[in-house]
Amino acid sequence: SRRGAPRPPIEPFGPLLPGCPPLDADGDVRLIEFSARRPLHPARFHEAIDVLLDGVVHARGRLWLATTPDEAFWLELAGAGLRVGAAGRWLAAGGDGSPERWAMASAAWDETHGDRRTDLVVLAAGADPARIAEALRWAELTPAELAAGPGEWAGWHDPFGAMHADPCEDL
């Protein structure tokens, strides 16, 4: 067996291998929370996924895609594996929910959009948190796009359809 000091990790996720990642401000491992009250433009979000695939260890959360205003989507990313799939109807669109779900939704209920929102948590190793947040903000609808409303949004190209997994052929 080899003796001496252990060699430093040679891959970007090396700091995660011992178990508890070092989340100190000087480290390369970061936890990024992203929340948006405007829907995501599906084509721009599809492009923003490339940023998530570069240095992101794990990401998960629900998405509000403009082209499907009544359906919530769920994103799950681990390493290079990605899945975006249906997560049910928003409560504001008549979705079923337990009393607990209604209570949680009512705490952040929006008069216009109800419980529709995007919430993602991203664990990144060696990735730039500002770049990730910028890519996700870029995917949000602009104020003019938001004002156009769901009738306009329905005609946009949606690379997600009912679900999405990488590798993706819709680039």
Go through each PLM region and give its residues.
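Well-ordered alpha/beta subsegment
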Residues: 113, 118-162
